[in-house]
Design a protein with these regions (language model features):
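Histidine-acidic metal/acid-base catalytic patches
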Residues: 4-41, 48, 53-68, 183-201, ...
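Active-site acidic/histidine proton-transfer and metal-coordination neighborhood
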Residues: 10-16, 20, 96, 100-103, ...
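Acidic (Asp/Glu)-rich catalytic clusters
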Residues: 32-35, 59-64, 85-104, 121-131, ...
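Active-site mouth loops of central-metabolism enzymes
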Residues: 41-53, 108-117
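Active-site-proximal loop/turn and secondary-structure-junction residues that shape catalytic pockets
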Residues: 46-48, 74-76, 110-113, 141-143, ...
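Glycine-rich, proline-tolerant flexible connector loops at the mouths of alpha/beta enzymes
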Residues: 71-92
Length: 289
């Protein structure tokens, strides 16, 4: 998707142009009675082209959809569209978030900024100011050999130890690559689970792995208690590259949330990064699942 197309879809999502009408007010206003016992969150990367320039406006819009929690991307690590937020301290960004009607409990950090002890110490201070519970590494464990993956897992365990001393929990976020790339027909992700110390590092599951043939709920049940959160995506049955409103795609969400309890999930973050216009519909679906 090119930048112009993405911005068009983002603008449509921000303006809720035509989309509000497809969900009756009675549905949108309903509380989450049946209870997924986790706050409804979203990943800020979805709105990367606007949230850096207009953080309050963007977050207030998402709060109006029913979202309660935002997972930030480290401005210093991600730069790019998040660069305008670098000027804020953790305390300042927390105030902006709270004043917009949201909480923040988790943030993504890049491999480069957390695998240097000096940089990590500064990031831990920022995270504590922001009020985080989880510091999630956005990737970096994949490698060409098993030995190199093990070495990187050892690095991640070291990060987890320092984050734990800082009063938080470290997490690791997968992408499809951890499943697509294999050693002896086993996904690299499985190998990572063997070498990551669960007492130091938990996992954040990217549901998009379903498009590579791997279901989050299978991992939740096979590895109970090892997951702290998940990024939620859903895809058209006829086109697995097309993001759709949750509940209209290929993911069995009732089974997902049943298994999430076993997996240990504390937070969920909707992340429809190629089509922000479906974010409101996803909020409505989750509140009424």
């Amino acid at each position: 998707m090119n930048r112009r197309s993405f911005l068009g879809k983002t603008a449509a999502g921000l303006a809720a142009s035509g989309f509000l009408s497809s969900f009756p007010n009675s549905i949108l206003a309903m509380s989450h009675k049946k209870g997924i016992n986790m706050p409804l969150g979203f990943q800020s990367y979805v709105y990367r082209d606007v949230i850096g320039q207009k953080p309050e406006e963007t977050m207030k819009l998402l709060a109006s959809y029913g979202y309660k929690n935002v997972e930030w991307c480290s401005p210093k690590g991600y730069q790019g569209p998040f660069a305008p937020l670098v000027k804020y301290s953790g305390k300042e960004l927390k105030k902006i978030t709270n004043d917009s009607g949201l909480q923040t409990t988790s943030c993504h950090f890049t491999w480069k900024e957390i695998t240097n002890d000096e940089s990590l110490a500064e990031r831990i201070e920022f995270a504590n100011q922001l009020g985080l519970k989880h510091m999630v590494c956005s990737g970096g464990l994949m490698a060409k050999t098993e030995d190199e993956v093990k070495k990187r897992c050892d690095q991640m365990n070291h990060v987890g130890e320092l984050v734990k001393k800082g009063g938080m929990i470290a997490g690791y976020h997968n992408h499809n690559g951890e499943f697509d790339e294999k050693f002896s027909d086993r996904p690299q992700y499985d190998f990572m689970l063997e070498h990551i110390d669960p007492s130091l590092v938990k996992m954040q599951f990217q549901v998009a792995a379903i498009t590579s043939g791997f279901k989050a709920q299978d991992y939740f049940r096979k590895h109970p208690g090892r997951f702290i959160s998940a990024h939620l995506q859903d895809y058209s049955p006829s086109d697995h590259k097309k993001e759709v409103v949750m509940g209209t795609g290929i993911v069995n969400w009732k089974d997902f949330f049943a298994a999430a309890k076993v997996g240990g999930l504390k937070y969920i973050f909707v992340e429809m990064e190629s089509d922000p216009s479906v974010m409101q519909g996803c909020a409505a679906y989750i509140k009424n699942i």
